[in-house]
Amino acid sequence: MPKIKMIVGLGNIGKEYQDTRHNVGEWFIAKIAQDNNQSFSSNTKLNCNLAKVSIDYNNVVLVFPTTYMNNSGLAVSKVANFYKIAPAEILVAHDELDIDSGEIRLKKGGGHGGHNGLRSINQHLGTNDYLRLRIGIGHPGHKSKVANYVLSNPSIAQKKDIDSAIDNGICFLDDIINYKLEPVMQKLHTK
């Protein structure tokens, strides 16, 4: 059975994007690093910011691509090749429009659902056989509003809900790392 060796937090690089809904994946790995007293360092060769942590006695690389969302797969594939990490050993944390704020879901494989970061990862890895932690940000209501919505900051109440979902996901991280997925899915997917 595989174990997670890389956690990718999707988002856009730069202060202007740091607090936007599209960066909730980055918030997730930043919280993991903070909880483990680790900081990120820039790795220009691998097109990302990296931190290394130990979770339940497993060495895990935290990756924040510095390629912007639409080309995240470049960094993910470079890091995976460098550390010899298989797609099944990767967890990607990302924003999810189709899930309400405050909720979080775990998924193995699946399509990109219009998410350009996932689309890029699928293309660069040549597969969608990796785990995804889908952090709910809610939907603005109409397709035409999506781009502005994901690139804007959440309200204070919504930010609190998203932070709560991130904390909830981190509570199950040991089991996710060790591929004990069924009990995690049951707990996360049950209201």
Curated annotation (Swiss-Prot):
Site (Discriminates between blocked and unblocked aminoacyl-tRNA): N12
A Gene Ontology molecular function term of the record: tRNA binding
Catalytic activity: an N-acyl-L-alpha-aminoacyl-tRNA + H2O = an N-acyl-L-amino acid + a tRNA + H(+)
EC number, as in UniProt: 3.1.1.29
GO annotation, biological process: protein quality control for misfolded or incompletely synthesized proteins; rescue of stalled ribosome
CDD domains per record: PTH
Residues of the active site: H22 (proton acceptor)
Residues the record marks as site: Stabilizes the basic form of H active site to accept a proton: D95
Residues involved in tRNA binding: Y17, Y68, N70, N116
GO CC term, one of those recorded: cytoplasm
Primary localization class, coarse: cytoplasm
Protein location: Cytoplasm
UniProt superkingdom: Bacteria
Disulfide bridges in this chain: none
UniProt keyword terms in alphabetical order: Cytoplasm, Hydrolase, RNA-binding, tRNA-binding
Complex formation: Monomer.
Family to which this protein belongs: Belongs to the PTH family.
Protein task: Hydrolyzes ribosome-free peptidyl-tRNAs (with 1 or more amino acids incorporated), which drop off the ribosome during protein synthesis, or as a result of ribosome stalling. Catalyzes the release of premature peptidyl moieties from peptidyl-tRNA molecules trapped in stalled 50S ribosomal subunits, and thus maintains levels of free tRNAs and 50S ribosomes.
UniProt-recorded name of the protein: Peptidyl-tRNA hydrolase
Organism: Francisella tularensis subsp. holarctica (strain LVS)
Gene it is expressed from: pth
